[in-house]
Structure formats: structure tokens, C-alpha cells
From Swiss-Prot:
The modification Phosphoserine is found at S330, S365. The gene is Azi2. The lineage of its organism: Eukaryota, Metazoa, Chordata, Craniata, Vertebrata. This is 5-azacytidine-induced protein 2. It comes from the Eukaryota. Ubiquitinated via 'Lys-48'-linked polyubiquitination by TRIM38, leading to its degradation. Its main location: cytoplasm. One of its GO terms (cellular component) is cytoplasm. Residues 332-351, 356-390 are annotated as: Disordered. Residues 40-198 form a coiled coil. Keywords: Coiled coil, Cytoplasm, Phosphoprotein, Ubl conjugation.
Length: 404
């Protein structure tokens, strides 16, 4: 305002100066000067008044503007005061987001590290697996080669086991052989007793045809006189025949024991000739047609002599020797006709699997007349017809032992 007033005064002064410079010719008159000064004051006053109005308008506009700015400032302060809680939440959210980003970066780094470790471990495991597969393949090939070598060359342990089993079998066979020897000794003693107490063989040959028809009726009756002697002599012949068979069995068992011992010593390499001999001996013992039984302790007669029953024969007395020869010849033919497949030796059922249990011994009996081998004869084995059956039986036993 002061500047404006000063400007107005200056303007007045300039006007005055300008007016003073433009002196009119009538300036000498005092009335004209008063009119001019009055006119200048009026114009100056009007100009000042006009300027004052303008300044008042401007001042009111500025006040309005200041008031509006003050209102805006107050509103901004109120907004700032009200938005302080939101800012805190925004700050918290920002800090949380920053922490989450940091955790994400850490997890990414850990994941990369773990994936790298896993790839390395997987690579190492695959290499180990390949090595193990190669080792397993090598072990399989080694096992297969060892199995092939074992099949070709069995180890000593298997031979030892086989040797032990063979020794056990040999021990069992030796025990059976001892039992058979005891049986043979008992039978020999009984035969000697029967030979001492029995009558002559010629009387038995004369009385056999007369006594045989009466045998079925006297089966359960004690025998006396020539009938009893005939039965005793017949039992003697049967025992002699079975003794020959037992002797053959013992010879074959001894042969088998020797073969088993040689097989165990030679690592179970069985010779072809031994197998053929064993099959031949087993064929000799294959007496499938014979089923006669002999009791170890026969009942005694009232006179203190052992009684024995023999089945009746349908052949006449004059053909008795020929029938016995045919029996022996049929045995030899059956022995030769028996097939031999080279299998292991097996004892036949004809001589007593249960001999140690029921106190009895089962012997082979003569074949029946219905068999095909019955009646066949060979001149090189049969003795002269003048010899009694006992003598040619001994000769036949000797021939069998010689062949065995």
C-alpha cells in the first residue's frame, strides 16, 4: 500500500512538474493556478480511490485464497492424523512382504542346493548299482561255473557223505549177515540132530509113496515111526536146500560189501564189470516163485523129536528123483531168465523182511507144475539117476557156488 501511495504521490508530483513545465501564458494569474491545482487534486483523488478499490478487491481475493488454502491444510492435517493407523499397517505389511521375499530367496537357494545334492547322490547310487550289477553278474557266472565243476568233479565232502552212507549200509548188511550166519549155524545144528536121529535114506525112499496120501489127515497129529522119520527126512532135504540158498545169499552179500567198499574208496566210480556181476548175483537171488516158510522153533512131538509137515506130491514114487531134479533145474532156469538191467542190488521178498520181528525165516519153495520153466532140464547140471536126491542136491549147490 505504501508503495502504491508513493507511486501516486510521484505521479502527482510528475503531473505537477509537467504542468509546471507547460506554463501557460495565463500562469501569471492567481485564479487560473487555483483551478489547475484543484483539477489535479481531483484527478489524483479519483486515481487513488480507483487504485484503492482495486487493491481491496485483490485483498479480498487473497483472503479467500488464504482461507481456502488454510482449509486445505486443515483437511490435510486431519487426513494425516486419520491415516496414521493405515500407514502403520502398510509398514507392517511391507515388512512382512520383505521377510517373505527373503525367506523365498533362502528357500530357493536351499532347494537348489538340495536338488544338486540329490542329483549327485543319484549319480553315485546309479554308479554303485551298476557296479553291484556287474558284481552280481560275475558272481552268477562264478556260481554257474562252480556248479558245473561240482557236477563234473564232486568235492570231497560229498564223497565223504557218500562214504559214510555206504559205511552205514555196510554196517547194516554186516549185521544182517551175522544174523544170517547165526540162523545158518542154528539150522546146521538142527540138521545134525535130525541126521543123527533120522533113519536111513533108502527106507524113506521106499516108504514115501505109502505115507504121502495120509499126510493131510495127520497134519495136526503127532507122527511116530516111519511116518515121522519120512517127515523129518523131507524137512532135512528142505533145510539142506535152504541152507544152499542161504550160503548163496551170504556169498552175494559179501560180494556186495566188497563192491561197496571199493566204490567208496574209488570215489563212487562203479566199474561196468562190477555192475554186471552184481546184476548177475541179484538175478540169481530173484526167486519170485518160491514162498515156503520155516519156523525157528518147531513144536516137539511127545517123543522129544521135532515134527515137520510137507505138502503132498502128486508125482509117483519112481519119478521122485526126476521131479527134484526138475525143481533145481527150474530154479537155475529162472535165475538165467531173470532180466538184468544193471540196477542196484535189492533183496527179494522171498527171504524174510520181518524175520527179526516174528522170529521166523522165509525160504523159497519149489515152483509149481503150472509154471513154464517147470520140467526143463540140462544134462550138464543133473547128476546120474542112481544117486539119491541128497547127493545131487549137494552137487547142485557146489555148482551154484562155483558159478557165483
Amino acid at each position: 500500500m505504501d508503495t502504491l501511495v508513493e507511486d501516486d504521490i510521484c505521479i502527482l508530483n510528475h503531473e505537477k512538474a509537467h504542468k509546471r513545465e507547460a506554463v501557460t501564458p495565463l500562469s501569471a494569474y492567481p485564479g487560473d493556478e487555483s483551478v489547475a491545482s484543484h483539477f489535479a487534486l481531483v484527478t489524483a483523488y479519483e486515481d487513488i480511490k480507483k487504485r484503492l478499490k482495486d487493491s481491496e478487491k485483490e485483498n479480498s481475493f487473497l483472503k479467500k485464497r488464504i482461507r481456502a488454502l488454510e482449509e486445505k491444510l486443515v483437511g490435510a492435517r486431519v487426513e494425516e492424523e486419520t491415516s496414521s493407523v493405515g500407514r502403520e499397517q502398510v509398514n507392517k505389511a511391507y515388512h512382512a512382504y520383505r521377510e517373505v521375499c527373503i525367506d523365498r530367496d533362502n528357500l530357493k537357494s536351499r532347494l537348489e542346493k538340495i536338488s544338486k545334492d540329490n542329483s549327485e547322490s543319484l549319480r553315485a547310487l546309479t554308479e554303485q548299482l551298476q557296479c553291484k550289477e556287474v558284481e552280481l553278474l560275475q558272481l552268477r557266472t562264478e556260481v554257474e561255473t562252480q556248479q558245473v565243476m561240482r557236477n563234473l568233479n564232486p568235492p570231497s565232502s560229498n564223497w565223504e557223505v557218500e562214504k559214510l552212507s555206504c559205511d552205514l549200509k555196510i554196517h547194516g548188511l554186516e549185521q544182517e549177515l551175522e544174523l544170517l550166519r547165526k540162523e545158518c549155524s542154528d539150522l546146521r545144528t538142527e540138521l545134525q540132530k535130525a541126521r543123527q536121529t533120522g533113519p536111513s535114506q533108502e527106507d524113506i525112499l521106499q516108504d514115501r509113496d505109502v505115507i504121502r496120501p495120509s499126510l493131510p489127515r495127520e497134519e495136526h497129529v503127532p507122527h511116530q515111526g516111519p511116518h515121522h522119520s519120512d517127515h523129518m527126512q523131507h524137512a532135512y532135504w528142505e533145510l539142506r536146500r535152504e541152507m544152499a540158498n542161504l550160503h548163496l545169499v551170504t556169498r552175494v552179500q559179501a560180494e556186495l560189501l566188497r563192491q561197496l567198499k571199493t566204490a567208496a574208496a574209488g570215489k563212487a566210480c562203479t566199474q561196468v564189470g562190477c555192475v554186471e556181476d552184481l546184476g548177475r548175483d541179484s538175478a540169481k537171488l530173484h526167486l519170485a516163485n518160491c514162498t515156503a516158510a520155516y519156523k525157528r522153533h518147531p513144536p516137539l512131538s511127545p517123543h522129544g523129536k521135532a515134527t515137520c509137515y510137507a505138502p503132498p506130491s502128486t508125482l509117483p514114487g519112481d519119478r521122485k528123483a526126476f521131479s527134484d531134479k526138475a525143481v533145481l533145474q527150474s530154479w537155475t532156469d529162472n535165475e538165467r531168465l531173470t532180466p538184468n538191467d544193471g540196477a542196484d542190488f535189492q533183496e527179494h521178498n522171498s527171504y524174510g523182511r520181518n524175520s527179526l520181528e516174528d522170529n521166523s525165516w522165509v525160504f523159497p519153495s519149489p515152483p509149481k507144475s503150472s509154471e513154464t520153466a517147470f520140467g526143463e532140464s540140462k544134462s550138464k547140471i543133473l547128476p546120474s539117476p542112481n544117486l539119491p536126491p541128497l547127493h545131487y542136491l549137494d552137487q547142485h549147490n557146489q555148482n551154484c557156488l562155483y558159478k557165483s
